Amino acid sequence: MVKEKKKADKKGDKSARSPSSISDNPEAAKQEISASKQEVAPSAVIPVLETPLKQTPKRDSEHTYQSEDETQYEEPILTKLIVESYEGEKVRGLYEGEGFAVFQGGNTYHGMFSEGLMHGQGTYIWADGLKYEGDFVKNIPMNHGVYTWPDGSTYEGEVVNGMRNGFGMFKCGTQPVSYIGHWCHGKRHGKGSIYYNQEGTSWYEGDWVYNIKKGWGIRCYKSGNIYEGQWENNMRHGEGRMRWLTTNEEYTGHWEKGIQNGFGTHTWFLKRIPNSQYPLRNEYIGAFVNGFRHGQGKFYYASGAMYEGEWVSNKKQGRGRITFKNGRVYEGLFSNDHIAQFFEAEMDYSYSLDRRSDISQRSRQARGSSVSADREPETLRKLDGSESRSVLGSSIELDLNLLLDMYPEESQEEEKKQVEYAVLRNITELRRIYCFYSGLGCDHSLDNTFLMTKLHFWRFLKDCRFHHHNITLADMDRVLSVYNGIPIEEIHSPFRTILLRTFLNYLLQLAYYIHHKEFQNRSPSLFLCFTKLMAENIHPHACQVKGHLFNEQQRTLYSMNYIDKCWEIYTAYCRPNEAPPYELTMKMRYFLWMLKDFRMINKELTATKFMRVIAEDNPFVYDGMDSNFELELVFLEFFEALLCFSLCCMFDQMTRSYLKAPYDDVTTNRYGSTQTVLNQSIHRSPSGATSHDSEVHFSSTKSSLDKIGVLPDGKIRQSEPKLKKSLSEDKVSKMNLKAQGRGLVFMSPHGEKYEKSKDEQKEKLNMWVNNLYVFFVSVLFSAYKHEEALKEKVEENRLQEAVLAQQKQIENEELEARLNILREEEARRQDFELDITVLKEPPEVPAVQPLTPSPPKEDLVSMQTSKASPGKKKKK
C-alpha cells in the first residue's frame, strides 16, 4: 500500500509537469524535453508512521497498579503493518535516534528518528530507485536535500513539503542539460539559468513562470547568436535586441511571438578592411510586420544614400523619397522596389542646369513649403548618381543653391567652380579632420563605422576658434538651420548626425556668413571666404582637442555615462529665445540660477569661479572688468562646465553639506566607488541583466552612447580588474612573476619609477571617477530630482487651490441663490400678510358718515355733564 501510494503521488507530480518548449532552437528543445522527463518533483514523503506513532502507548489493565519504572510500552499496531523491519533505538515504544526502517513495498529509510517520526538528516529510497538525501521534518522532506533519479539526474537545493521550492540546481542524466535558479512547487519559477549543452554555449538566463520563459531574459544560441529582451510563453515577445553574429546583423525593437513585429531598427554590419573608417552602415528604422519591412520606414545605405517612405514585404512600394549618395533627391512613387516612373527622372543635366531656378520654383510651389524646408537640389542626374559634372566626383555633391542665390546670376557658375576647386585642394585634409573628430570618444566599432555628431562638430568649431569671430555656437546653429532646413527642436541637438558632404556644406555656409562682408566687392567671393577660413582657423588649430570632454579617451568614456541625464536637465532649464525661430536656449544667467536652485553655489563653487570656468574657452564672457551673462551656451559648453566643476571643487564638503539638507531622495551613500560606477553606469553584469531593474537599462530608442558612437564596454571591462586592485595586490602580483629577466627590471630604479608612476595614474583615475560619481549622482542628479519633486508639489498644490477656489465659488453662488430665494419668499410673505391685514380691519365711523355735520361745541359739553351727574349720584 505504501509503495503504491508513493508511486501514485510521484506519477501525479509527473503528469502535472509540462516540459518546457523551446521553439527558438530545435536542438535545444529536444534536450529540454528529454530533461523535463527527469525534472519531476518527488511527492512529499508522508510515511504512515505519522498518526499511529503519535498516540499515547497503552498499558495492560493487569498492571494498572505497577510502578512507573516497570511500565511496558508496545509499538503502535499500524506501525507493525507498515514497517516490515526496524533496526535502531526505541524510547517508550517509539523510534528514536538513528535507525534503519524497511517499509512495505520495498521503500527504505536510514537516518534520524524523533518520537517515532523521521526527523533530521536521513536517506529515503523508493523501490523504483529514486533517492532523497537531506533534511526531514516530521516525516516530510524539508529545507535542503538532494534527489537522485535512477537515470543519473540529480537535484540539490531547497525543498518544501517534498517538492523543489526555493533555490536549487538540477542536472539531467541523459542529456547535457542543467538548470540553476529558483523553483516553486517543483517547477522553474523566478530567476534562473538553463544550459542546453556541455560546453555552455547554448543557454538562457532570466525570468521563469512555472517552467515557461516569461519576463526579461537573455538567450544565447549554440551558433553564438544572442537575444536580450522580453519573453512570453517561451517566445521572444515585447521589447528586445537580437544579434546574429553569424550574419553580422542586429535588430532592436518590438517582437511578437518570436518574430519582429512593430517598430524597430535592423542593422547590417559590413566587414571592413583593418584600420579603415566608414561613415555609415546599412540600417533600417521603421515598421515591421511578421519579420518583413512593412509600412513607413527609413533605410540608410552604407554609401550615404537614404530612402524614406512606404514598404511592402521588404520592398519599396508606394510614395517615397530617395536621396542618392551625391545628395540628389527623387520624390515620387515606387513599385516593386523600383522607381515607378524611371524615364521621367532621366532628364538631361545641361537642360536642368539652364532651368534650375524654374524647376526649383515650381517644385516649391507644388509642395507649398518654405525655402528653408525644401532647399534640396531638385535637378536630378541619372538615378545611379553617374554623369557628375562636379569636380569633387559623384560621391560628394555640394549644396550651394542658397549661397549662390546671394550672387548675381552671371557670376554664379564661376563662384561654384572656384569654390569646388578650393574644396578639392583641401579634401584630403578635410576628410582627415572629419575622421578624427567623428572618432572622438569611440572605443570600438564592429565595422569601423564612425559618424560625426553635433557634439563632435561643436568641439571642432571651438578648437578652430570659429567663435572668436564674434559669433557664438548657438548663433552658428541658427545660421545652419536656415540654410539646411533643420527642425526647430533639433537646432541645438547634440545627437544630430553629420555626413561628410554635410560637414563640407556647413563649412562653406559658415565661411560665407563670417567673411562675406569683407569680400563682397571681390570675385570670386565665396572662394575667398572659404580660403581665409581654412588658412586662419582650420589649418592651424584643427585636431588640437581642448576642453574637458574629449581631451582624454578613458575619461571621455566615463563622462559619456552621464550625458543623457545632463541633456534632460539642460532642456528642462532652457527658455524660448526672444528672436526667431524662438527655439529653446540656455543662457549663462539661467545656468547660474539653476545651480543656485540646486544649492550648489557655495564657498567651493562661487559665482566668480562659475564665470571663470565658462570664460576659459570663450573670450567674450569676461574681459577682466565686466561679465556677459546673456551669452548663450550650447550643450557641449554646459556639459564641459559641469565636468570642470567636478574637478575644481572639494566635493566631499559639498556632498556632506548637501546631504545635511532635508532631502528625502538624496542617496545615503555619499561616496561612490570605482566599482559602483562601473557596475551601475557602464555595463550590466549577467545577474543584473536578468533582474527586473534591467528593464530600465533597455530602451527601444537608442541611448546617447549609441547616438554618439561610444562603445565603452570593451575597454572599461578590461580596465575594471585593474581598478579593483590595491597597491599591495599589485606588489604581490609582481612578486609572483618569474624572476628570469623581469626580476631585474622590477628591482631597478627605472622599473620602480615606472611602477610608481603607473600606480599614481591608477589612483588619480580612481579619485577622478569617485569625484565624478559624487558630483553627478549624489549632488547634481539628486538636486534635480528634488527640484522636480518640488515643482510637481507646487503644481499639485496650485491645482488643488484652484479646485478649492472653484468649489468655494460654486458654494458661494449656491448660497447666494438660496438667499435670493429666501428674500423673494420673505417679500411675498410680507405682501400676503399685508393684504390679509387690510381685509380684516373694521370700517371707521367717520368714514361711514362723512356728510353728517358736527354738533355744536356747547351741546357736546352739556351732554357730557348730564351723563356724568347720574354716576355721581349712584356712587353716593
From Swiss-Prot:
**SUPFAM superfamilies tied to this protein:** Histone H3 K4-specific methyltransferase SET7/9 N-terminal domain
Q: Which GO terms describe its cellular component?
A: 9+2 motile cilium; axoneme; cilium; sperm flagellum
Q: Does the keyword Coiled coil apply?
A: yes
Q: Where are the MORN repeats?
A: 86-108, 109-131, 132-154, 155-177, 179-201, 204-226, 227-249, 251-273, 284-306, 307-329
Q: Where in the cell is it found?
A: Cytoplasm, Cytoskeleton, Cilium axoneme; Cell projection, Cilium; Cell projection, Cilium, Flagellum
Tagged with keyword Cytoplasm: yes
Instruction: Name the major location.
Output: cytoplasm
What InterPro entries has UniProt attached to this entry? MORN
Basic and acidic residues biased stretches: 1-16, 57-66, 373-386
Residues covered by region (Disordered): 1-72, 360-386, 841-876
UniProt feature coiled coil, ranges: 752-841
Q: Which Pfam families match?
A: MORN
Q: Recite the UniProt keywords alphabetically.
A: Cell projection, Cilium, Coiled coil, Cytoplasm, Cytoskeleton, Flagellum, Repeat
Self-association and partners: Interacts with RSPH6A. Does not appear to be part of the axonemal radial spoke complexes 1 or 2.
Annotated function: May function as part of the axonemal radial spoke complex 3 (RS3). Radial spoke complexes are important for ciliary motility.
What's the protein called, per UniProt? Radial spoke head 10 homolog B
- Organism expressing this protein natively: Rattus norvegicus (Rat)
From the broadest rank down, the organism's phylogenetic lineage runs: Eukaryota, Metazoa, Chordata, Craniata, Vertebrata
